Amino acid sequence: MDRKERVARLVDHATNPRYKGPLEDADVAMPGGGHECGGSVVVYLKGDGNGRIEDLSWTGQGDTISTGAASIIVQKVHDEGLGMDEILDLDYGEFVEGLGRDIIGSRTRHATLGLSTVKAAIRLYQRANRSGGRAAV
């Protein structure tokens, strides 16, 4: 993908976000971000109890980079059927490279807000699942 295509993809995801909206039956609702990182998101996760994700969505607001990147990572999870451990293993640097480091510039925190919040939601879900409880929603 060249630079122009990467910019168009990011803008498309920011203006037409995928999987955006709360999950009513989520096991986890994980807030992330703040003013210092380009926006805020809440990631909603429903797990199957066996390391797989039944459903994943997000809500939030921010700049084109933070909202576009959040939409891209959630769509990637859906499209590729990634398991929880696979998501936790995703490399932030590789994710930023895929978005286009030249586009992101110094706004790495904006670009990784969605991914870091998805990872935090998974860790909370796994802790609750190991202890036999339910994650805080």
Regions inferred by a protein language model and the residue ranges of each:
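Flexible, solvent-exposed loop/hinge segments and secondary-structure transition points
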Residues: 25-28, 55-59
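Short beta-strand elements
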Residues: 34, 39-49
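Helix-adjacent hinge/juxtasegments
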Residues: 45, 54-56, 73
